[in-house]
Structures are given as structure tokens and as C-alpha cells.
A protein has these predicted regions:
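Basic, Lys/Arg- and aromatic-enriched nucleic-acid-binding interface segment
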Residues: 1-46, 50, 128, 139
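Short, polar N-cap/turn motifs at the start of nucleic acid-interacting alpha helices
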Residues: 55-61, 121, 140-162, 185-191
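C-terminal secondary-structure termini that scaffold catalytic or DNA-interacting sites
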Residues: 70, 94-96, 156, 171-191
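Active-site/catalytic core of tyrosine-dependent DNA strand-transfer enzymes
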Residues: 10-13, 79-120
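Catalytic-site neighborhood detector that most strongly recognizes the C-terminal catalytic loop/helix
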Residues: 6, 65-72, 150-175
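Conserved tyrosine-mediated DNA breakage-rejoining catalytic core shared by Y-recombinases
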Residues: 9-14, 18, 42, 51-90
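Short basic/aromatic active-site micro-motif
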Residues: 29-33, 103-107, 120-139, 148
Length: 191
């Protein structure tokens, strides 16, 4: 059974408020909160972010040599909007960890956040569905371009005939981040 679950606008606000409240109360949650925020803002897969190292980070994007859809030896570019970059920059003092986000899975925090926000059926992977939904519906980004940002290989045949410039991906990821952040005040940690 395929699930089609993404957060509602009201759930989005509650999730951000709860993440920021918890971070303010307990700074040891910085890596877990940051992981969830980059999932929300980038549309990346959890496994991609968990494995991303500081060497993979190139400012505007993370480039992975090994990733889920690597069947032809091509790297996967995860484009980062200004919101994602701010979150990652907040972790730069933590470079003693090999991976950017410093943890493999923020599941424990996520499970308690989604319960507190009364959206207990919302999985971490559903944040990726939310990204795609916002991209297509609110930010008016074409399906092919959303697929490119999310690393979907099912559009590979279309990509042979249509090419998306880096500039377009950079603009699109910024639009999505701004749309996700509408109505949300970031704490100073991420500004």
C-alpha cells in the first residue's frame, strides 16, 4: 500500500515551533533538529543526509559519490537553499564529526515531536513527500525540475532530452525553502 502523506500548513507550523522549542530547551538536540530541518528544506533522502560528509559539501549543494540511485556512476547533487545552508553553517563548529549532520537518524526526536504536534502518522520520509508537494503546488516548479532536486531516477529518460541548468536548480530550491518557511520565525541559531 502506497502512502500519500504530507504535512498540512498547520502541522508544518506546529512542527517548526516544537523543534525550535526543544532546541531552545536542550542544545544537545542541535544535530537531531538540524537533521530534520535539512530533510524538510532539501527534499533529500534520510540516508543521503546521514552519509554526507564535510568533504561532500560545496556551499550551494552536497555532492554524493555513493547514493541510493547510483547505477551509472553519476554523483547525486543535493541542492541547498539558504535555509539549508544556514542550518549546516550552524554545525560548522562541530566539524570534529565526519558527517555534516553528525548522526545517522533523528528518529527518537522525530517520534516525540510528531506526537506533540498530533501528527503521529507522519513519518520522516513524509517530509520528502511534503517537499515535493510544496514544490509542485505552492512554488509552481515543474515536475521534471522537482524530480531533479529530489534525485528521482525515474525521470532519467526525460532527462536525456531535457536538461536543467544548475542556475535553475539553485533558483528552484530557494523558492521551495521560502515557501516552506512562510509563517515561520527561525531562531537565531539558524539565521
Amino acid at each position: 500500500v502506497k502512502r500519500e502523506r504530507f504535512y498540512s500548513p498547520d502541522e508544518k507550523i506546529l512542527i517548526f515551533q516544537e523543534l525550535f522549542r526543544r532546541l531552545e530547551e536542550d542544545n544537545s538536540l542541535l544535530h537531531s533538529v538540524s537533521f530534520i530541518l535539512v530533510l524538510i528544506f532539501s527534499g533529500a533522502r534520510k540516508s543521503e543526509l546521514a552519509s554526507a560528509t564535510w568533504d561532500d559539501w560545496h556551499g550551494d549543494y552536497i555532492e554524493l559519490k555513493e547514493h541510493k540511485t547510483d547505477k551509472d556512476g553519476k554523483t547525486r547533487k543535493i541542492w541547498l537553499n539558504s535555509q539549508s545552508r544556514s542550518v549546516i553553517q550552524a554545525l560548522q563548529g562541530e566539524k570534529k564529526k565526519k558527517t555534516i549532520l553528525g548522526i545517522k537518524n533523528p528518529k527518537r526526536l522525530w517520534n516525540s515531536v510528531k506526537l506533540a504536534c498530533n501528527c503521529k502518522d507522519l513519518r520522516l520520509h513524509d517530509l520528502r513527500h511534503s517537499f515535493g508537494t510544496i514544490s509542485t503546488n505552492a512554488a509552481n516548479i515543474q515536475t521534471l525540475q522537482t524530480g531533479e532536486l529530489m534525485g528521482h531516477k525515474s525521470l532519467a529518460i526525460m532527462q536525456r532530452y531535457q536538461h536543467i541548468e544548475d542556475k535553475t536548480s539553485k533558483e528552484n530550491i530557494e523558492k521551495i525553502g521560502n515557501e516552506i518557511l512562510s509563517g515561520i520565525d527561525l531562531p537565531t541559531t539558524y539565521q
